[in-house]
Structures are given as structure tokens and as C-alpha cells.
Amino acid sequence: MRKICVVTGSRAEYGILRGLMKAIKDDPELTLQVIATNQHLSKLQGETYKEIERDGFTIDYKVYMADDEAPDNANTTAKAISRGVSGFADAFDALQPDLLLILGDRYEMLAVASTALIYKIPIAHLHGGEISEGAFDDAIRHAITKMSHLHFTSTEAYRKRVIQLGEQSDRVFNVGALGVENVMKNEFMTKEEIEQSLSFQLTDKCFLCTYHPVTLSNMSSETQVLNLLMALDDYKDYHIIFTYSNSDTSSQIIIKRIHEYVDQNTGRCMFIPSLGQRRYFSALKYVKAVLGNSSSGIIEVPSFGIPTLDIGDRQKGRIVADSVIHCGYSTEEIKEGLKKAVAFGHKKIDNPYYKEGTCDAIMNVIKTYPLDNIVQKHFYDIQ
């Protein structure tokens, strides 16, 4: 049987991959292998690998990258990548996968792909060809594309960009975004169930906010998040759910400042490491807008007909739905954006990332595509 190894480094990413992982696990022609790494294994981030196990998956290997005791700087991130390369080498020796499946543009996936390249393990990559100009994730994503052998893009424009990068057109598949398909399949919680699970009231006026470091910005993450929090002071009648930043450099100062704000606004605000996909999608049915700079605000949130206030440059360059409102980093720009978001209301939105049958399309390729000599690639020149 073909051994498909899925690597996941965070709860958000795992939420996207979970349905596909189950399909692989349940297929009699495939064997699922799971590697958990980085944020999943961090105590600061809640040791979310336990959720993978609760869902009935076996974690075949754990690769420790995060150092919870280290300072929040570039040195720590770079060393995490080096630990990842070493750990993935051991994992690949132990598991001997036939195909590696990875998603996105996180630095832990750069460690995975670099190691797999040396081991001559074919890579199937999801969400290549996208643009996010404000973060070094953008360069990592394109680098992973060049180290990958099968490509599953979320739009036709991104499929063309992967081909533009020299990938052979018969190996690049526009399948849509798994996250959007997951919205359609989600078992939604009731408002009361969400409130009980969070010990937090979802009033008629609610925001959901996630703010990540903008790793290529000259403005400090602290200044950015303080500007956002000052803008939110104009909305004292709104309840706000904040979720944690990712593990990029400067994430800890963002988390610290939001914690302070939530402590000063007890009852009106709450802060949680992660809602988990089911509860996150369920909460989106009861909030007025999503704020911050997460890719989820661009990809999945439009399916709920509510606005996304996309702050700054982190997601700059992505294809967006009509419900996405862009604004700059200053408090005044965020205030103007919030006014537009509040006025937006609820509308039926065409989500550019939706395509029917995403999981089935990926499964068909990873089951049937010939893997013999696939690691030797030819640069595809556009005529």
C-alpha cells in the first residue's frame, strides 16, 4: 500500500487537513502516517497534538522544533528550523513514506521540504502559488513549490502561477481550498453550546480577532497590535474573542499586549489559544466581523457572508472576495475599516476559493499518480 505521510505543525493547519487525513486513513489502498511538530508540541501553545489523538489518529512521529524557554527572536526561529531538519531526518528514516503531504508556507514546512528533498521523497503541496507580500511565508511558499512534485492549488490563477514557476502543468491541479469545503461539512454548534464551552456570552455585537506578526514589516508588532487595541476602544459595546498568534518571531509581544487588554476588559473580551475548527466555524455564524490578518479571514470567512477587516500587508496580494475590507496599520485607518465592517451587514458572497469536491480530487491524484521517477523534474517553460 502507498504510504502517505501528513505533516502538521499547528491546530489551525490540522483543522484544514483533518478531513483529508480521515479519507486517507479510511482508504484500503493507502496507509496514513502522521508527523506532529512545532506548535503542536509546545506547552505555550497548548500541546495541541492531543487533539489529533482525540480524533482517533495515531501520531507516528513527533519532531520537536519549538523552544518555549528561548527568547522571541529570529535566532530562536532559525534554530527551530535546524532542529526540524534534524528531527525530520530521523522521522523519514523510521517511516520511509512513499509520498509526503504538506500544506502552506510555514517555516516548519520549509524544514520538512528541505529534508524530504535530500531523502528523495516526493512531496504533494497544498496552497502553492499564493501571494502574501508582508511575510517571509511568501518566499517559503514558493521555495516549497520548487521542492514539490504534485501541486494542489486553491484557484486557477494560483495554478497558473505555479506553472509560471516552472512546474509541469500535468502535475498542477486546481482543486479549491480544503478549508472552504470543511465549512460545508462542519457540524455546527448552537450558540448556547459555544457560550457554554467558552464561558463567554455571544451578544448581538461580537468581533472575532486574530493578529499574527508581519515578519517583513518595518513597524514593530507591538506598535501594530497597540494600534488595533486602541481602535477597538471605540467599540466598548462589542464583545471580542481574541485567538492566539502563530509562533512567528514577535508573536509573544502580541500575545502579551492582548492579554493585558483582555484583563482590562473582563467580561467584554476573552483570549483563547485556539477555538478549534468546529467551534471556530460555529462562532462565525454569530459574529459581526472577523478582524486581523489571518489567511482564514481571506479564504474561509467569506463563506459565512460576514466581512473581514484585513489589517496591513500580511495577506497583501491574495485573491479576495467582495467581503474583504483592507486597511493600514494606524489606529485611524483601523477605525475607518471598522466602520465599513460594521456597516457591511450580512450578504451572500461568492467565495473564490470554493470548488466542489476538493478532498475527492486530491485523493484521486495521491492514489493514482505514478510516483516512479517523479522526483526528477523538468523545468516547464511557458511558450
Residue spans for each PLM region:
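Nucleotide-activated sugar donor-binding and catalytic core shared by glycosyltransferases
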Residues: 1-383
